[in-house]
Amino acid sequence: MNPDIVNLESNLNGEGLRIGVVMARFNLPVCEGLRDACLDELLALGVEPTDITFVTVPGALEIPLALQAMAQNEDDSYDALVALGAVIRGETYHFELVSNEAGAALTRVGLDFDIPVANGVLTCDTDEQAEARMAEKGRDCARCAVEMANLQKAFYD
């Protein structure tokens, strides 16, 4: 790459970052796997335990409202937010509805409030697929939140 090009490198240093995490309780065993992997990775990246706020909500459709409340809370500001949940296909159209609406709402929170939102809401056909993906997806969301928080800071500093 041309050395004159401004290149903002990936930064996975979580020191000093405040992260909000919202987890759905529906499909709880999978969500707990996502949670454990995400929180462990946030700590491994240097985020202090006291700089992590963790909240649970009933299901995936409730996650965006909780994230929105975190995003607009000026007294307790966050650098990034994480959504964790699991939507597993059933026999009705409900799977598509929940998956699509939750995903769109998570994106809207990030854009409306100018805050990174890591989407860790798994959408899988089976419990087995969700269980196979939960650990890596949880870690990935932690890395995404830290990297994007640092990128936002680089843009605005």
Curated annotation (Swiss-Prot):
This is 6,7-dimethyl-8-ribityllumazine synthase. Pfam families: DMRL_synthase (PF00885). The active site is at H94. Keywords: Riboflavin biosynthesis, Transferase. Its EC number is 2.5.1.78. Coiled coil: none annotated. It comes from Laribacter hongkongensis (strain HLHK9). NCBIfam families: lumazine-synth (TIGR00114).
